[in-house]
Swiss-Prot record:
Alphabetical list of InterPro entries matching this protein: Ac/propionate_kinase (IPR004372), Aliphatic_acid_kin_short-chain (IPR000890), Aliphatic_acid_kinase_CS (IPR023865), ATPase_NBD (IPR043129)
UniProt-listed Pfam families: Acetate_kinase
Name the UniProt record assigns to this protein: Acetate kinase
This enzyme's EC code(s): 2.7.2.1
Chief location of this protein within or outside the cell: cytoplasm
Keyword line: ATP-binding, Cytoplasm, Kinase, Magnesium, Metal-binding, Nucleotide-binding, Transferase
Organism: Campylobacter jejuni (strain RM1221)
Pathway this chain belongs to: Metabolic intermediate biosynthesis; acetyl-CoA biosynthesis; acetyl-CoA from acetate: step 1/2
Its biological purpose: Catalyzes the formation of acetyl phosphate from acetate and ATP. Can also catalyze the reverse reaction.
SUPFAM superfamilies referenced in this protein's UniProt entry, alphabetically: Actin-like ATPase domain
Record gene name: ackA
Active site positions: D145
GO molecular function: acetate kinase activity; ATP binding; magnesium ion binding
């Protein structure tokens, strides 16, 4: 099948084109709504690039340029030649708990739950509507970050607030990075040559946004992110877990509005709030130069991660493997080392040489004597979205 995967942001569209699960093109529309907008399409088979720089006023104009570049490159005759288009949607809310093909109800529901993800869902919606207009005959699939976590039990996803908050306002833990956690856990099963229904893993997706997931027999049992992607781990610029009583205290202390507090927690906190850097390469360079705040930020990040992974040992009946993925998880050997050393009493023994090797691809980095497997699995959310889209189209 010919599948286009779209990840529409407020001012950008990232895309990948798959033909029978092989990536043939990828690209980006950036700075939508600005005068210096840019569209780049790369033929991934021969690395040839096609670019346009012009003013793009909206997503519809951006996708029309993508269509022109597909024709120019000879990769795809027209968007109408696609079998389907898979759209990454951050939040499905309570009603859209599973991936699905798009219809009028789905469009309305994505719009309705935009209040839960105001920076993401409206842009995703614009991407879907643009695709429907550009290629009316092509099936569109909504692939939700939240869907993988639909298997969490109620005692794991409920907050200890008055029940009406859940019943009437859908306030509960939803979890995110679901497409990534689903992909790497299935890849881990293949790597270990085990049936996914026999495997229990703890997946750590570590990037500027970060989350951990306890996966029992291929199903999410718990995850660190909650009602929004702010809960859980310390992240690049997000604070993660904190005492909620801090918020009204800070509001009175600093005279901050609700919106300003939201910005503080999402964009000015995390490791960035501690040391002024959110790129771990910068943080580790600063540590080498004696920056104590950088060292503190890294220690805090790893400690919170260890606490979550450790707690998921208690959640799962047994744990077979820990998976590191995402930009930090795949590339930062120091973070992996610090985390695994603190978990040694649980039977994890890292092979330091394997851990330090800077090689791409799926690999095992535990010592032969380790009771648990420690895996590095590069995530591929676009491939997972393409796979699910094909599956949904096949069912219909």
């Amino acid at each position: 099948m010919k599948i286009l995967v779209l990840n529409s942001g407020s001012s950008s569209i990232k895309f990948k084109f798959f033909d029978n699960k092989i990536v043939k093109a990828s690209g980006l529309v950036e700075k939508i709504g600005e005068q210096n907008s840019k569209v780049v399409l790369k033929n991934t088979l021969n690395n040839e690039s096609f670019e346009r720089e012009l003013t793009i006023n909206n997503h519809e104009e951006g996708l029309s340029i993508v269509n022109e570049l597909f024709k120019e490159s000879g990769i795809l005759a027209d968007l109408n030649a696609l079998d389907g288009c898979g759209h990454r949607i951050v939040h499905g809310g309570r009603n859209l708990s599973e991936h699905c093909l798009v219809d009028d109800y789905v469009l309305k529901e994505i719009d309705r739950v935009s209040i839960f993800a105001p920076l993401h869902n409206p842009a995703h919606l614009a991407g879907i509507k643009t695709m429907i207009k550009a290629a009316p005959s092509v099936a569109n699939a909504a692939i939700f970050d939240t869907a993988f976590h639909r298997t969490m039990p109620d005692f794991a996803y409920m907050y200890a607030l008055p029940y009406d908050f859940y019943d009437k306002h859908n306030i509960r833990r939803y979890g995110f990075h679901g497409t990534s956690h689903a992909y790497v856990s299935s890849r881990a099963a293949k790597f270990l040559q085990k049936d996914q229904n026999e495997l229990n893993v703890i997946s750590a997706h570590l990037g500027n946004g970060a989350s951990v997931c306890a996966i029992e027999k291929g199903k999410s049992m718990d995850t660190s992110m909650g009602f929004t992607p702010l809960e859980g781990l310390i992240m690049g610029t997000r604070c993660g877990d904190l005492d909620p009583a801090i918020l009204p205290f800070v509001s009175h202390l600093k005279g901050l509005t609700i919106e300003e507090i939201d910005t503080l927690m999402n964009k000015k906190s995390g490791v960035y709030g501690i040391c002024g850097y959110n790129d771990f390469r910068d943080i580790e360079r600063e540590i080498e130069q004696g920056n104590d705040k950088a060292r503190l930020a890294l220690d805090m990040f790893c400690y919170r991660l260890v606490k979550y992974i450790g707690s998921y040992f208690a959640v799962l009946p047994k744990t077979d493997a820990i998976i590191f993925t995402g930009g930090i998880g795949e590339n930062d050997s120091l973070v992996r080392q610090k985390v695994c050393e603190r978990l040694a009493h649980l039977g994890i023994e890292l092979d330091f040489e394997l851990n330090k090797q800077r090689i791409s691809g799926e690999r095992m980095i535990n010592h032969a004597n380790s009771k648990l497997k420690v895996l590095v699995i590069p995530t591929d959310e676009e491939l997972e979205i393409a796979r699910i889209t094909e599956e949904l189209i096949g069912k219909n």
